[in-house]
């Protein structure tokens, strides 16, 4: 019997664990497994990296007495990771040839990027023994979508046709702008039975080009919109915000009711100065009622000192009225956040929020860029450690369980 690659992937969804088994090898044969893709939208990658960027990883294995290598049971003894880790080849993918892309500002021309195509090869002494291809997906095949265009925000709704009204989640990504990262997170959440609305609050055509004086009323309008959908349970709406999207979400929670629960990933407890390109805008990030929200200006000297001393700001400049927040609140933050001090911010939010249910998931090695399970994270490529990827799985699984428990099973108000 020749070498054969067995792909064991029941759901084929990007955040699900799978196994790859190699059969028909010689007893105790050393092999190299190579995983490749040039059809891959990676939420953790820079915005200008195209989906046809070439990614590759490899690992060395020794077959057992039956001539079998199983990624969930066999330890890698070399390559891009070592030890037993069934998703190690996926997590350790590296961008070998980066292809840059132009920004797409027109929502109707923005692709879903919901399919990822992989190629896997098995070699012994550099001789090819077997190869195969397979796909994984950001959303299930039965999830539909459509676009929304409003005066100052745009969105993409993901939903499964159903006779029952379902809970919904509003999804906001960070300072990169646009909707690409938000939509792929929204797709992942829709697989759990939620209607999801990914929002672009700046950076697309016919809306603000910079993260500067964005109206809080955008989220009020989005909430009212999703509450009126025939297939949505209007009393069970959650919100997910990451980075500046978490700041935007928390500010919304301080001034509006109607959100059943929230997950804030790498949050801030205060409003920071807006951005004009890569420079400070000299204005607030957000407005309310046509007026700028009080904000903390960016000061390079203070930033450097705080980074070196590992301290956070001790003033109250721009701190939100967190005491007004009452919905169940899950915070995900890092003690090594390289962008801002989400750890101290989370502690302050936990102390002040009046939520009847609240929790923090802390990461110690994974920093600010923390999205879904099993994605490679090029921001932390110098850290060759399993813990970064374990913390990504922990964070994402807690995100899913929080929304499921609060929106499907909780009867508290």
PLM feature spans:
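Hydrolase active-site cap/lid region
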Residues: 250-307
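Short beta-strand/loop motif that positions the catalytic acidic residue
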Residues: 325, 331-333, 337
């Amino acid at each position: 019997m020749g070498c054969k690659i067995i792909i064991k992937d029941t759901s084929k969804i990007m955040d699900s664990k799978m196994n790859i088994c190699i059969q028909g090898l010689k007893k105790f044969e050393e092999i190299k497994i190579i995983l490749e893709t040039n059809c891959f939208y990676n939420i953790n990658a820079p915005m200008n990296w195209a989906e046809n960027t070439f990614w590759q990883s490899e690992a060395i294995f020794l077959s057992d007495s039956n001539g079998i290598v199983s990624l969930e049971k066999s330890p890698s003894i070399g390559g891009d990771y070592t030890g037993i880790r069934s998703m190690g080849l996926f997590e350790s993918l590296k961008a070998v040839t980066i292809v840059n892309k132009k920004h797409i500002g027109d929502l109707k021309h923005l692709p879903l990027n919901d399919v990822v195509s992989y190629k896997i090869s098995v070699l012994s002494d550099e001789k090819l023994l077997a190869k195969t291809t397979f796909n994984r997906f950001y959303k299930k095949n039965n999830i539909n979508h459509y676009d929304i265009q409003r005066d100052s925000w745009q969105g993409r709704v993901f939903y499964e046709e159903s006779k029952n009204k379902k809970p919904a989640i509003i999804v906001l990504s960070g300072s990169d702008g646009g909707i690409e990262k938000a939509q792929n997170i929204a797709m992942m959440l829709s697989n759990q039975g939620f209607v999801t609305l990914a929002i672009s609050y700046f950076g697309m055509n016919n809306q603000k080009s910079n993260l500067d004086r964005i109206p809080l009323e955008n989220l009020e309008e989005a909430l009212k919109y999703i509450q009126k959908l025939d297939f949505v349970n209007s009393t069970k709406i959650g919100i997910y915000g990451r980075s500046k999207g978490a700041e935007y979400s928390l500010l919304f929670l301080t001034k509006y009711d109607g959100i059943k629960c929230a997950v804030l990933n790498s949050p801030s407890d205060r409003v920071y100065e807006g951005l004009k390109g890569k420079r400070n805008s000299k204005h607030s990030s957000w407005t309310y009622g046509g007026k700028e929200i009080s904000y903390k200006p960016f000061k390079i000297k203070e930033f450097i000192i705080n980074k070196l001393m590992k301290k956070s700001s001790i003033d109250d400049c721009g701190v939100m009225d967190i005491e007004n927040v009452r919905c169940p609140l899950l915070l995900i933050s890092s003690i090594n956040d390289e962008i801002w001090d989400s750890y101290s911010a989370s502690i302050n939010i936990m102390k002040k929020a009046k939520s009847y249910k609240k929790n923090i998931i802390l990461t110690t090695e994974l920093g600010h860029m923390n999205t879904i399970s099993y994605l490679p994270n090029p921001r932390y490529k110098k850290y060759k450690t399993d813990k970064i990827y374990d913390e990504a799985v922990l964070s994402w699984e807690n995100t899913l369980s929080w929304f499921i428990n609060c929106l499907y099973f909780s009867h508290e108000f």
